[in-house]
Amino acid sequence: GERYLSSLGLKSRLETKEALHSVSLEQGAAYLKETYDLKQTIPEIIKDVLKIVADFYKYEAVLKPGVKETLEWLEEQGIKMAVATSGNKALTEAALERNGVADHFGKIFTCTEIGLGKDEPDIYLAAAEFLGSKPQETIVWEDALHAAQTAKTAGFVVLGVYDESGKDAVPEMKEICEEYFDRMDAWLAGHK
């Protein structure tokens, strides 16, 4: 959102980053149009945002610290994994491939495919069903406050991990999540 608004000569408001963090692309475009009174149509906003996001995922996106090691260990333990993202599927696949972790996941679920954002539990429920587990037996790693709240309310075990975009929500994340970590391998250190 911030890069898109900047491309229009607009400054992103503080609350915009959190508002966009756990919603579908369509929901985010509608939010930007309404909040910033944009003349662009929702499909035009989506197209422009996808171009910006595509460049980021293809050329810039890096894994959070400790993710690769944690995924490798989980796979060695025979734990099945899936991705539940509010991002675009093709871009998520590209970023996972570029970072060498795509093979750890059995499937990628997107809010767009599910038809709802992470403010509803459907994406987590679909992933759990695919994995053959019940919510209370399924760990959800989250870095977004609203998404963590949704997963927790739906009965999932929620582990929080730091993300720069959600730094202002860390105290709330620590309250909501079963455990909260600055990096994923901090969790791994306690489970090896």
Predicted regions and their residues:
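Asp-based, Mg2+/Mn2+-dependent phosphohydrolase catalytic module
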Residues: E72-E75, N88-K89, E93-K192
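Structural motif
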Residues: A19, A84-S86, W141
